[in-house]
Design a protein with these regions (language model features):
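C-terminal catalytic "cap/lid" subdomain
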Residues: 2-75, 80-108, 112-380
Length: 380
């Protein structure tokens, strides 16, 4: 127990910026309405962190759930237009509830609605970062949500666990707190007959850890433990910490930053990625794949080398110079790296397997020695 406390203290005592992701199940009542009392409690805790000197961003789910409650809809809509319309109604109620609660403590709620494009476009990415940091100076608390009304992918495929990881990396925040309806990551599937125990600390999100994820989807929530582990993996690989905890635990946020044994703490990797490498490795959707042989994989993953044409065995997808691509093992097609390519897919198809000295002979020109330079690559 003492060792666990020491580890928590060692990691969490360095935190200055905190991203708090609040799930739908934490924010809404059983009938789907915004739980204003719960928002008031959480808003008070966020303000406490602000007064303790932390910069805090709230990533809030609940727009669709709030809209369903406002409209008296029991069943989650199935069509995209209905989902987007319900989200438009619910988002205004949600941000209004936050603003009302923050104003009781002298703070403003600043609504920040984002789409995938805001992260993938480098200029918009940096503008978003600058805006949020400016809000920190204005006595405002950013409340971030996916723009459900116009964002197709979020409603169909994703949720705010992924968004919270992107925001954490965007801001280089040292801690992501994911508040859910569960106490943390359990060591087994909890049932009436089998008692499950929360794992206090996870050093590495291994295959075995991923197998512990179980689907806790509700009628109004989208993400289960699997998506939370995926978010935790993105953040810890960038060198920051993650805590998954129960959002209805009294004083949960203060307990976490004060290093109490609450929830599951996922330890960060020792090396912190630069902002640019976070953007390359975990923000942009890759446009294609490059498959490499064992020698190239070892040189990239173990020795930190650049990717040369000689180690490439195959190309998948159509992409241009400057696009982000995935780098995969030849045998099992596992993605182990991402990077910014110096050559297009058509060019790589021609020079794959060639030595660097032969590139000019094959193409008639040579743009770079490397297909992907190590400075533009992230090992996942």
């Amino acid at each position: 127990m003492k060792l666990r406390d020491d580890i928590r203290s060692q990691i969490l005592s360095k935190v200055k910026k905190v991203v708090v992701k609040i799930g739908t199940g934490v924010l809404t009542t059983d009938d789907g309405y915004v739980d204003r009392e719960q928002i008031r409690r959480l808003a008070g805790q966020v303000v406490e962190l602000k007064k303790m000197g932390y910069d805090v961003v709230v990533v809030s789910s609940g727009a669709i759930g709030s809209g369903m409650g406002e409209l008296g809809i029991e069943k989650r809509p199935s069509t995209l237009p209905e989902l987007q319309a319900v989200a438009a109604i619910g988002q205004s109620k949600l941000i209004g509830a936050y603003d009302e609660c923050f104003k009781l403590h002298g703070y403003h709620a600043a609504q920040v609605l984002l789409t995938r494009e805001d992260f993938e476009d480098r200029q918009r990415y940096l503008n978003t970062c600058n805006t949020i940091h400016t809000l920190f100076q204005m006595n405002a608390i950013p409340v971030v949500n996916e723009n459900d009304t116009i964002s197709v992918d979020e409603i169909k495929f994703g949720d705010n666990d992924a968004l919270s990881a992107l925001v954490t990396n965007l801001l280089n925040a040292e801690l992501l707190i994911i508040l859910s309806s569960v106490d943390g990551l359990y060591d087994r599937f909890p049932t009436a007959k089998s008692k499950a125990t929360v794992i206090p600390i996870v050093e590495n999100i291994s295959h075995e850890i991923k197998q512990l994820a179980f689907d806790s989807k509700t009628a109004r929530g989208v993400g289960g433990m699997q998506t939370k582990l995926e978010a935790a993996s993105v953040v810890t690989n960038a060198g920051e910490a993650v805590v998954i905890a129960n959002g209805r635990t009294e004083g949960v946020l203060k307990k976490i930053v004060q290093c109490e044994n609450v929830g599951t703490l996922f330890l960060p990797k020792e090396e912190k990625l630069t902002s640019r490498k976070r953007w390359i490795g975990y923000t942009i959707k890759p446009k294609g794949k490059i498959y490499v042989d064992d020698g190239a994989m070892h040189a990239l993953a173990e020795k930190g080398k650049s990717l040369l044409a000689s180690g490439i065995v195959a190309v998948e997808g159509a992409f241009s110079k400057g696009d982000i691509v995935s780098v995969c093992k030849r045998e099992n097609r596992t993605i182990f790296a991402r990077g910014l390519t110096n050559y297009s897919s058509q060019e790589i198809e021609k020079i794959k397997g060639c030595s660097t000295s032969h590139i000019a002979k094959v193409l008639g020109y040579k743009l770079y020695d490397e297909v992907i330079h190590r400075d533009n690559m992230v090992i996942l």
